Swiss-Prot record:
<dbReference type="InterPro" id="IPR003774">
    <property type="entry name" value="AlgH-like"/>
</dbReference>
<dbReference type="GO" id="GO:0005829">
    <property type="term" value="C:cytosol"/>
</dbReference>
<dbReference type="Pfam" id="PF02622">
    <property type="entry name" value="DUF179"/>
</dbReference>
<comment type="similarity">
    <text>Belongs to the UPF0301 (AlgH) family.</text>
</comment>
<protein>
    <recommendedName>
        <fullName>UPF0301 protein HDEF_0602</fullName>
    </recommendedName>
</protein>
Amino acid sequence: MNLQHHFLIAMPLLQNTYFERSVIYVCEHNENGAMGLMINQPVARFTLERLLKKLNISSVHDAGHLNKPVMSGGPLSDDRGFILHSPQSGFNSSIHVSDDTMITTSKDILKTLGTKKQPKNIMVAVGYTGWQKGQLEQELIDNVWLTTKADTEILFNTLIPNRWYEAASKLGINIFHIAQQAGHA
């Protein structure tokens, strides 16, 4: 089972935890573990514009686009930035996640924000979520997460508060109708 380019959708049993109602985009999943970014937890009052100012990158032409919030990608390395975007070459540190998505960790992509060189779709996160070997698989057995193939419409264009519900809807379920506790038969 490889969950790269899938969503992990937090089950209701994660209520009152860091991952309550979270949707995680899995960027990498292999025999050594997994890495992903929460796509629906904005950092309070932290926009792309504020990020650029903090990094001393001058704002460019389309400042309206810079009002997008920066996401909290997860509790690990919250001093590091990760940029999910539609495929586009020319950045120093980019990896293809899927045919529709790349992840870049170099600052050169930030200099394109608001210019014609900016990728069509973009989401910036600080921090990430990670699992050691076998940890994610055990969480799936324990009914912590639902999984579905990622959808770039949800990833880049769905309103942030709606992403949890919409990701679960891809499975044909209403997440609000799922019990907080699950059992095993």
